Amino acid sequence: MLIAQYLWELILFLIIIVGPIPLSLSLAFENHKENSNYSFPHFLLVLLTGWSLAQICIGLILGSADRLNLAAVIIAEMLICAIGLILIYAKNQKSFSFSQWQIPQLKQPLIPSELLIIGATAFAGFVLWETLATKPTTNYDSLWFHLPVIARWYQTHSFTFLDAAGNWIFEHEQARVYPYNWHVLSALCVLPFKEDFLTAFPMLIAWVLEGIAVYLLSIKFGATRFYGMAAASLVLTVPMMLNQVNTIHPDLPLAAIFTVALYLGLSYHSSRSQSELSLFLASVGMIAGIKITALVYAASLLGGLAILEIKRFIVNKNFTPTNFRIRHIKPVLVCGILCCLFLGGFWYARNLLHINYPVGDSREINIPLQPVAPPSPVPGPKPPVPGPKPPVASPKPPVASPKPPVPGPKPPVASPKPPVQQPTPTIPAPSASPLLKIWQSTLAAQFNPSNISHWQMFGLQVLIRLQLPFLAIALQASSAPLALIQGKTRIINQNNIILTVVLASTGILYVITPYTSGTAGEAIGQLSPLLGFNLRYGFPFLSLLAIAAAATATELKTRKQVIVAVVLISSISGIISNTIFDLIKNASFTGKSIVWGSWLIDRFKSHFAEAINLVIKILAPRWPDLGIYPLIYVGLLLLAGILFKRNPSLIGLKNLLASLKKSSYIMIICVCIALMVSATWVAREKRDVARAELYRGIYEYIDKNTVPNEKIGFFLSYRSYLFYGKNLDRQVLYVPFRADRLPAWMDNLHKNNIKMVGFGPLTEMDEYTKLALSWLTSPEGPLQPVFGKDFNTESVLYRLKY
């Protein structure tokens, strides 16, 4: 890549990032005037929340107008930036210079233990940035339906889920009606680079928001600054939390915006700030548009604030109806209400207009039409051995398309073996209703407290996925009754009641969230190791548990030395565990291991030695990747220890910073910019190398052997994103595969001018599909292999012979 091109793309990216900042600053300054308890973390929360809201609104407006392209986005960002600067100038004409902006300062200087906590968390954040910038994702769901959505938006400049032939772009029925608010941020990050570099950057923003919100809520519920920082750090360094940043999963953003909205609602309840109420309403709308199950969280927040306001009106006799009402509605509140309706209703209104959902059943949607029409089955060419249909007297009904896998990863299947005995047709049992199956997929429906194996499976997944940070949080929070007994002051107050209710509510919402059992709800009383992968649905509960732990630690005055030690160990152990999880996932992705992480964890129950040996075998070639971060971390801790020992109060450092002249600050800023430019350059180069290794060179093959906008058909693949190419400029068409309609399927390929098809790795399917694929890819079949070797374990490409 030419340095000029790289610098130009980086400048465009920075324009997109900086655009909404003045508008967010104007909101933060307005809030500063209304809230007497304003603090620097509160300022950062308002700034980042306002930035996220503005960016998503820009993306939704442009995407709905079919203008989600780089030029339109840059113009919109510049316009938003100008509006923000005008608002700041109009409200602060006398102090418009940057040096006079009212950015709040820390009320008390940071002590060494707090600096250590901040430093450990910042180190984890740096590692996350390095990971998302240098390593492409191998996450199952991200490659299956999250990233293909973003790629298609990038190609069409609009929010479409259809390919060029009018078919769905992925084989996930439910994903067609998901809301995608947070994905809009990722789509904006794709535009300047024309590839998925920094596509996961919004996940890092969500990670930061999560930490700030947990800290502020801890303070709100009575914790001191030190314990609030510790709680936030422990939540952020949970291995499962770290492992979600380099994905496009909406669960971390959901937890982050939920805790943000909870804090803003409680802050408004005490400060009566209209800007905070505006942000609260807009955040609630954003939550509703992040995920379908988030509708319950959004409704809970609105209902909770309504209850608090009604209680305030009833209990306080001096609180007259005039004071209860907002006398003068400011424009900022009107904007918040409009954002709530727009962000919360956009995707659901779109679904109602485009595909008649949820009014109609998504399985009965006939628009767009599938390419294979429903005439009577046409028998396909017979493979050499055995025939594609069993030699039974009764006719066999047409074989349906294979169902999409259960959400979450599944282990690749081994190569198909020829059946020993053909199955006898049976009358299928009536399937359960969709709503019943959804309920049966929840942990509440499947978990049997009297079943020891259920406790073992769930406990082992929690222990290995969440590790020391969760154990420390849970242990401290569980000592709350002790604080109630020993407390000399009144413990049962409104704040503690609110915290208890919200904690219990988020716990209940987790266990009744679909797929928390790891199963699809086909039967009752079953748990799957996939429940460990789906622990991410419980992030809101984990956040509230950390807040409760901070409040409890404050009441019990838990020793700070112990807390600091736990935080420092949790930070590096979380980083190492996250790296291990990635290496195991990558080994399964590339076919070097056939065991997925959740199944490997479950194997520790009965085959401990075998599981340990398998982990060592996977990690053996990657020991340097595991050792580099601990070495840097220990080195930084030693440096900090020497610095604190020589100057505990850091007066010398403060005096040095105070003595710097304006020119020195400018020089430091220039050096930081130069480091950022060079670091991102190196990161992109490293990402290209890692992508070629993990994706096995499929991007390189597509770039060299196909032309932009060439059509590539795919079927039976949960990695369809790989077929778009590095620059996302290949037309990827979904071609539903029917083993009993091979001639019609081939005609459909020719009709759509598809000369190359991709599929694999394969999941569970019927024997006839396996036999049909074996014939298609045989020397006598119509497909010629051009990339990949084993479609059972990797994505492969074939060209049509005729």
Please give the residue ranges for each predicted region.
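Membrane-embedded, hydrophobic transmembrane alpha-helices
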Residues: 1-107, 463-467, 471-474, 554, ...
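Hydrophobic, aromatic-rich transmembrane alpha-helices
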Residues: 19-21, 187, 214-215, 312, ...
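Transmembrane-helix motifs of polytopic, lipid-linked glycan transferases
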Residues: 22, 81-90, 198-222, 260
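Transmembrane-helix signature of polytopic, membrane-embedded enzymes
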Residues: 38-46, 196-198, 214-237, 270, ...
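Membrane-interface transmembrane helices that cradle and orient dolichyl/undecaprenyl
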Residues: 220, 261-277, 311
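Membrane-lumen/periplasm interface segments of specific transmembrane helices
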Residues: 307, 311, 330-379, 414-480, ...
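Short periplasmic/luminal acceptor-recognition loop of GT-C membrane glycosyltransferases, typified by
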Residues: 691-696, 700-736, 755-764
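Aromatic/acidic, Gly/Pro-rich catalytic loop(s) in extracytoplasmic/lumenal soluble domains
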Residues: 755-802
